[in-house]
């Protein structure tokens, strides 16, 4: 896979999807006191449903990042974004966020929505830089989440 390519994940990608997701979210386990939901996702089912898109490493062809998205009538939900720790700072996350927005536009959807755990401070700095606005804070079971949206032009 070329580094700038973003493509639908295939069944052959499932082990890499799990590995990248686990590597990206493991640092948060201790901070939030439990595994973030993406770590327990049914990656094979998400891939089979066409919800997962992967991209390569700028230094090679292995999966370096991914997004899990789901289309609804009025928005595209960004369920998860994960970048392999050794690929952080290389533009992988930026490319994935731009892809999500382009994908929403291609589907004719007016906005992207997502949430992040309140203790994932890093994300609270990243999303506003890309035009996402905080629209709410909710407790969903054991997870306290900040909800964001980005309206697309």
Please annotate each region the language model reported.
Residues 32-33, 90, 113:
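A generic secondary-structure micro-motif detector
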Residues 91, 131:
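Short glycine-rich hinge loops at helix-strand junctions in the catalytic core
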Residues 84-86, 90, 118-119:
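Active-site acidic-Proline motif in GNAT/NAT acetyltransferases
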Residues 53, 110-130, 137-153:
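C-terminal "cap" of GNAT-fold acetyltransferases
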Residues 4, 8-80, 84-86, 97-99, ...:
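Acetyl-CoA-dependent GNAT
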């Amino acid at each position: 896979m070329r580094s700038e390519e973003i493509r639908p994940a295939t069944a052959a990608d499932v082990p890499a999807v799990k590995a990248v997701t686990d590597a990206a979210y493991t640092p948060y386990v201790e901070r939030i006191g439990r595994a973030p939901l993406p770590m327990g996702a049914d990656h094979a089912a998400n891939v089979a449903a066409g919800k997962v898109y992967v991209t390569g490493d700028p230094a090679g062809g292995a999966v370096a990042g991914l997004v899990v998205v789901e289309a609804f009538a009025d928005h595209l939900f960004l369920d998860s974004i994960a970048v392999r720790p050794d690929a952080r700072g290389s533009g992988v996350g930026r490319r994935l966020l731009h892809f999500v927005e382009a994908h929403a536009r291609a589907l004719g959807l007016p906005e992207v929505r997502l949430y992040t755990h309140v203790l994932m401070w890093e994300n609270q700095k990243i999303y506003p830089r890309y035009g996402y606005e905080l629209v709410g804070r909710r407790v969903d079971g054991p997870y306290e989440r900040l909800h964001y949206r980005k309206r697309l032009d």
